[in-house]
Curated annotation (Swiss-Prot):
It is found in: Cytoplasm. One of its GO terms (cellular component) is cytoplasm. Keywords: Cytoplasm, Metal-binding, Repeat, Zinc, Zinc-finger. Its main location: cytoplasm. A zinc finger (RING-type) spans 127-169, 293-352. GO terms for molecular function: zinc ion binding. Residues 186-215 form the IQ domain. This is RING finger protein 32. May play a role in sperm formation. InterPro entries: IQ_motif_EF-hand-BS (IPR000048), RNF32 (IPR042862), Znf-RING_euk (IPR027370), Znf_RING (IPR001841), Znf_RING/FYVE/PHD (IPR013083). CDD domains: IQCD, RING-H2_RNF32_rpt1, RING-H2_RNF32_rpt2.
Amino acid sequence: MLKNKGHSSKKDNLAVNAVALQDHILRDLQLRNLSVADHSKTQVQKKENKSLKRDTKAIIDTGLKKTMQCPKLEDSEKEYVLDPKPPPLTLAQKLGLIGPPPPQLSSDEWEKVKQRSLLQGDSVQPCPICKEEFELRPQVLLSCSHVFHRACLQAFEKFTNKKTCPLCRKNQYQTRVIHGGARLFRIKCVTRIQAYWRGYVVRKWYRNLRETVPPTDAKLRKKFFEKKFTEISHRILCSYNTNIEELFAEIDRCLAINRSVLQQFEEKYGHEITEEEWEKIQVQALRRETHECSICLAPLSPAGGQRVGAGQRSRETALLSCSHVFHHACLLALEEFSVGDRPPFHACPLCRSCYQKKILES
């Protein structure tokens, strides 16, 4: 009987141990206690059940805008642990078949882990998962002193479904948000900006020095003064107001005026005078009662009753379109010696108008 009882108790212990190990393995494979993975999927059913039991409350809208509280710099630089509360011990851990999970690290222990990471230079190097710089993106520190992007570690836990460090393969690590990479990136940016600014200031100062102080070398000094002379000449040329467009506009305006004057002249004097018009002009000249040539001041024709001698030749008389009468020979001489007039346009000696002439029969 005692043997049977002892044998049965051993079997019961083996069964309990097997069940405990299976339960631990199942819980470990389900992996419901990830550090940075999204917990929203595991809590959907709980939220739905709570929403059914929730009491609705009236919302009073006062019309006032809510004041947005800007996050302080201290809060943005604050470090905090991401791990949820540790799950209760499984049956295998309670029976001592599997060791319990490590306890939560204290602030001093986290400081030691952080110092170890700084000595390794993990924040200076790129993220081991995405191979990119940390810059200002969220950064997490593991309890094994390795550093990753928070989004990269979240994606790694999501697709591997294991809480294992991507580098050292440590299980059930703890995570803490740090800002060492962001701080180093800001220092790097400030250093680069200062370097660019100092370079700009020095280059500007040296360029001004080259433009104001002549060099001591003879060839360089010659080039320096040649450049200065060229700049001064260019400034003098630029100071002159040429106004080429205004000059061209004035030329076009003068040409248009000249064309209009010539067109009016051609309309007025370009056509030939008919016989009827010459008769009217001759009648008008007779009314003037002009008896002497205004050029030579000699009589246009012999006095009445006087005849021209055999050796003398009567002088021809020219009638102009302006109704003035002159000796034809005198008018020809005047046309020949006139400087400003060009044939066939000549000006009358009396009224200074252009004319056409007709020789009158004696």
